[in-house]
Design a protein with these regions (language model features):
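Hydrophobic alpha-helical membrane-embedded segments
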Residues: 12-22, 92-103
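Membrane-helix exit/interface motif
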Residues: 27, 43-44, 54, 64-76, ...
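Interfacial segments of alpha-helical transmembrane regions
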Residues: 1-14, 74-94
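Internal alpha-helical transmembrane segments of multi-pass membrane proteins, especially GPCRs
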Residues: 48, 86, 131-134, 138-141
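Interfacial loop at the N-terminal end of multi-pass membrane proteins
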Residues: 15-60, 109-130
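Extended, charge-rich alpha-helical interface modules
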Residues: 92, 148-149
Length: 157
């Protein structure tokens, strides 16, 4: 069971890190090429679509499985392996902290701007959203990648 939990931690964290990397290197650069009038509604639709279903499962699993792997005692796990799993869990938890305290409030402000009366110009909405969101997303991507590497290292011990 402990080996399975660590394997699930590696897989879920790897899936999450890959998703973050695709957003960082493909989706956001693609959206950056859009006009303000195209970018703002496109990002709103992404924010409505992404945090559901499979993504939500992976988002939760990338913290739950490392925590479970750490909680279950393992015969023969070295102190180094335990510390690597703990470090991976800390990176995943910090990733969630950035998401919950940074990206989600920006997403919520973007959604609220659609209903504002009078609505703010898309150029102002984009300026308030894009650079801060991208900066926070870079942090999330780096934390997710670090968590993945740390958990892979723990699994290889």
């Amino acid at each position: 069971m402990p080996t399975l939990l660590l394997a699930l931690a590696v897989v879920s964290t790897g899936l999450y890190a890959g998703f973050m990397l695709i957003f960082l290197t493909g989706i956001m650069p693609g959206l950056a090429r859009l006009t303000d009038e195209q970018f703002v509604p496109a990002m709103r639709r992404l924010n409505e679509t992404v945090p559901r279903g499979i993504f939500l499962v992976v988002f939760l699993a990338e913290v739950a499985f490392p925590a479970a792997a750490l909680a279950v005692p393992v015969d023969g796990r070295t102190g180094t392996g335990t510390w690597l799993v703990l470090a991976g869990l800390v990176c995943s938890a910090l990733n969630h902290l950035v998401t919950i305290t940074g990206n989600i409030p920006l997403n919520n402000a973007l959604a609220a701007s659609e209903k504002a009366t009078p609505p703010a110009p898309d150029s102002e909405v984009r300026t308030a959203f894009e650079a801060p969101w991208n900066r926070l997303h870079l942090y999330r991507t780096l934390l997710a990648a670090a968590a993945f590497v740390l958990l892979v290292c723990a699994a290889l011990l």
